[in-house]
Amino acid sequence: VDLEAWRIAQAEGKRILAMEDIEEQIDALRAVPVQRAVNFLKDCNNWPKYRKANEKAYLAGDLLGLSGTTTEFPTRTGHIIGKRDQRFRERMLPYLEAGNALALVGSAHLLNLRSMLEEDGFAVTACNRGFFSKIKV
C-alpha cells in the first residue's frame, strides 16, 4: 500500500514528505526486545493465522480488530509505537493545520494517532473506500 500510495502521489505531482528518517526507523528497530523478536520467529507456524485475522479486520474496516492482530509483531510495543506516534503527530500537524494534506501511517498507529488528532481539534473519520480503489494490493 505504501508504495502504491507513493506512486499515485508522484503521478499526481503531489509533494511527498517522510515523517521519520532512516536513523529514527533504525532506532525503533534497535528498541525491540531481543526475546520478543525470537519469540515471534519461533511462532512462525501461526503467521498464516495472524495474516488471515489481519486481512479480515482490514476488509471489515475494524480498527480495533486490526490493531489487535498486530500485537504479535516484535515492534508493536507501547514504548515503540507511542514514541513514534508522538513524532508522527508533531511532524504532520503543521501540514494538517494548513489543510489539503493526507497522512498515511501503518495500522498499528491508527488508534493512538486518531485520539491525538482529535485532542488537537481535528474531526477524524474513516477513509472513503473510493480512495483505496486506486491502490492495487
Map each language-model feature to its residues.
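Hydrophobic, often amphipathic alpha-helical segments used for membrane interaction and targeting
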Residues: 1-97, 115-116, 128-130
